[in-house]
């Protein structure tokens, strides 16, 4: 038994009913005019030409963001650029693909480690000026669910700060997780100040840096399928609202160039 390949998206009852039929409906002829689709090297050369320092790969889960991030980082490295490749995705695949001999500087946000270190830092500062009930209140406050998000956010800001000295390529988690991180920048900064008493420079500079189109670019990664494309369209709208630049879409598994 096998499921045949059909030249249409199997969405809706009508398409489900005809999926396994021997006789398939005739399809209208598609305009097969050859178009010039730039290759990924064109995108990378544009990043170099425009002096981008922070490059995100974003899109739905499973569209190939990690693979694209690695290709971009390796290509920039071949052009003599100092590159740091990072991932905010809890499913860290960078080491699996690259190993220890890639020559790239790698980092991964380990949520449990970041949470532990953030708690230790806040409590250490609290011990210097507090005791008794006040200290217990701070300790209890750190058990709130948002503490882990703040710890991850702080680590994210520290990764972005590396762009002072090198190009940072960031392989992001699936769309929703990343947008939450970006959209909450200001509120997280206030929460960091409330709990630790100060806002690190990396966090102060984060939002202006992400919104600087001369420095930051989002490379949208998708597949030639309905759901990934619609999700990328929604992502584009969200990025527009956040004032974060996105010029390029990279479509994986596309057969358009084979005509």
Q: Which residue ranges define each predicted feature?
A:
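Conserved nucleotide-binding/hydrolysis micro-motifs of P-loop NTPases
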Residues: 6-11, 90-93, 111-115, 174-177, ...
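Basic, amphipathic N-terminal segments
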Residues: 18, 27-29, 121-125, 129, ...
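Short, structured motif recognition centered on aromatic/hydrophobic residues
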Residues: 54-59, 67, 72-76, 84-87, ...
């Amino acid at each position: 038994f096998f499921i045949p390949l059909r030249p249409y998206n199997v969405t809706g009852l009508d398409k489900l009913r005809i999926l396994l039929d021997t006789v398939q409906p005739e399809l209208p002829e598609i305009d097969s005019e050859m178009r010039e689709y730039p290759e990924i090297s064109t995108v990378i050369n544009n990043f170099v030409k425009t002096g981008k320092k922070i490059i995100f790969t974003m899109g739905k889960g499973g569209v190939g963001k990690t693979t694209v991030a690695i290709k971009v980082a390796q290509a920039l490295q071949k052009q003599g650029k100092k590159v740091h490749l990072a991932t905010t995705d809890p499913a860290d695949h960078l080491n699996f693909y690259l190993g220890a001999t890639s020559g790239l500087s790698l980092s991964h946000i380990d949520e449990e480690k970041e949470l532990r270190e953030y708690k230790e830092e806040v409590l250490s500062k609290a011990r210097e000026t507090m005791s008794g009930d006040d200290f217990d209140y701070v300790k209890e406050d750190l058990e709130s669910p948002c503490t882990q998000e703040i710890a991850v956010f702080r680590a994210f800001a520290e990764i972005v700060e590396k762009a002072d000295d090198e190009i940072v390529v960031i392989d992001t988690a699936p769309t929703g997780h990343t947008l939450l991180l970006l959209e909450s920048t200001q509120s997280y900064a206030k929460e960091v100040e409330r709990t630790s008493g100060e806002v690190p420079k990396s966090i102060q500079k984060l939002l202006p840096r992400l919104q600087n189109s001369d420095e930051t670019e989002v490379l949208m990664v998708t597949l030639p399928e309905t759901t990934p494309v619609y999700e990328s369209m929604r992502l584009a709208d969200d990025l527009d609202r956040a004032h974060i630049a996105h010029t390029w879409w990279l479509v994986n598994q596309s057969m358009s160039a084979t005509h």
